[in-house]
Swiss-Prot record:
It is found in: Cytoplasm. This is UDP-N-acetylglucosamine 1-carboxyvinyltransferase. Disulfide bonds: none annotated. It comes from Chlorobium phaeobacteroides (strain DSM 266 / SMG 266 / 2430). Coiled coil: none annotated. Phosphoenolpyruvate binds at K22, N23. Belongs to the EPSP synthase family. MurA subfamily. UDP-N-acetyl-alpha-D-glucosamine binds at R93, R122, P123, I124, D125, L126, D307, V329. InterPro entries: Enolpyruvate_Tfrase_dom (IPR001986), Enolpyruvate_Tfrase_sf (IPR036968), MurA_subfamily (IPR050068), RNA3'P_cycl/enolpyr_Trfase_a/b (IPR013792), UDP_GlcNAc_COvinyl_MurA (IPR005750). Cell wall formation. Adds enolpyruvyl to UDP-N-acetylglucosamine. SUPFAM superfamilies: EPT/RTPC-like. The keyword DNA repair does not apply.
Length: 424
């Protein structure tokens, strides 16, 4: 296994380009299954373990792919299988994204129950409910979701999600674009990743109204075409890099971003005392002499993102006072707190709320990643900790951050990647 060895106490400053979004790449890649002919050319796809796993899943289905220099080419003409096996699906929850496209194109699908990050309940019930609304018959047996449609054609329907779900909205969208008739999705997720998926599907020939809102109306079409498309930036990676500069007292300029998609996060950085300036495609952050305590509540977009709460907790260990962090999306997403406390942080969990007491002098030690964003919080803490911090199980980090140690080293960090053996 790999670990990151971080020599703390170095200021993160400089200019860096944001990577393409993982969370928009995955549904876009899944949506290529909807086209029967042609080759897709997808630009700005990040080199990540999750992308590799997902392309392996598509290859298992019969899809042809090539990936070079962040450009993925996909041909879905020769799909041979509608079975997504456990060996691949267990590695990531986003594998469920193939359910909607397979059902829409072939009228059947068999997908293993998914894996992925291990924090709290993340049910797939909403995905299945949406497919059933569109006319699919769903069975769960022997660890698989088996779905089929009479007549092989989904039918338009009204899908009202009881809670906002990015994954379920994406799956419903991909299923509905080839369904017969009109589908209305209410309480749809409005995250930029869903907006990007809508743009992608529309460019393929789908008929979607309400892009960027919580109500989507889809008029099914007969066929969709392969296209060339450029992915959007990764707003969570961008916010994490801003936090790296802020926690170390540095300054940073991020290029290739859309500041409007970072509005909630940038507002909190300002409350924490940072200076923020934006251009049409860049953001600059200048740290204060002393960070100010700033409460956040993670909720669906456009609010503060749940995928940044772990990093914000790490940042607030250096703020001058008490900060309260609440996650309304995943109430139990606090696996990183014991590891941050091992570094010298003083963080308590009270009533599903993290109470961060700062500022605290952190000292390097060995810590273990438990999920993707938790690992990012440990890297941030290691950047400011005195001495050497070793972050184990960084395969979690590699699922969602493209060459993160190289980016941080280019900004002034001293991080090396080393092999280690984990004892059972």
């Amino acid at each position: 296994m790999d670990k990151l060895v971080i020599h703390g106490g170095r200021r993160i400053s400089g200019t860096v380009a944001a990577s393409g979004s993982k969370n928009s790449s995955l549904p876009i890649i899944a949506a290529t299954l909807l086209a029967e002919k042609g080759t897709f050319t997808l630009h700005r796809i990040p080199e990540l373990h999750d992308i590799e796993t997902f392309t392996q899943l598509l290859q298992h289905l019969g899809v042809e792919t090539t990936f070079n220099n962040n450009t993925l080419r996909v041909s879905t003409e020769n799909v041979q299988s509608i079975l997504a096996p456990y060996e691949l699906v267990k590695k990531m929850r986003a594998s469920i994204y193939v359910l909607g496209p397979l059902l829409a194109r072939f009228g059947e699908a068999k997908v293993s129950l998914p894996g992925g990050c291990a924090f709290g309940p993340r049910p797939i019930d909403l995905h299945l409910m949406a497919m059933e609304k569109l006319g699919a018959e769903i069975k769960i047996e022997t660890g698989f979701i088996t779905a089929s449609v009479k007549g092989k054609k989904l039918r338009g329907a009204h899908i009202d999600f009881p809670v906002s779900s990015v994954g379920a909205t994406g799956n419903a969208l991909m299923a509905a674009v080839l369904a017969k008739g009109t589908t209305t999705i209410t309480n749809a997720a409005a995250e930029p990743e869903i907006e990007t998926l809508c743009h992608f599907l529309s460019a393929m020939g789908a008929c979607i109204d309400g892009t960027g809102t919580t109500k989507l109306v889809i008029e099914g079409v007969a066929t969709l075409q392969a296209i060339e498309f450029t992915n959007v930036f990764d707003r969570i990676e961008a916010a994490t890099l801003l936090a790296a500069a802020a926690i170390t007292g540095g300054s940073i300029t991020l290029n290739g971003v859309e500041p409007s998609q970072l509005k909630a996060v940038l507002k909190k950085f300002v409350h924490a005392g940072c200076q923020i300036s934006t251009q049409s495609d860049s953001v600059t952050l200048i740290s204060p002499e002393q960070l100010l305590p700033t409460d956040v509540t993670a909720k669906p977009y456009p609010s503060f993102p749940t995928d940044m709460q772990a990093q914000w907790i790490a940042l607030m260990t250096q703020a001058s006072g008490k900060s309260l962090i609440t996650d309304r999306v995943y109430h139990e997403r606090f696996n990183h707190i014991p590891e941050l406390n091992r570094l010298g942080a003083h963080i308590e969990i009270k009533n599903n709320q993290a109470v961060v007491h700062g500022p605290r002098k952190l000292s390097g030690t060995t810590v273990m990643s438990t999920d993707l964003r938790a690992s990012a919080s440990l890297v941030l803490a290691g950047l400011v900790a005195e001495g050497i911090t070793e972050v184990l199980r960084v395969y979690h980090l590699d699922r969602g951050y493209e060459k993160i140690e190289m980016k941080l080293n280019a900004l002034g960090a001293q991080i090396s990647r080393e092999k280690y053996k984990e004892f059972s």
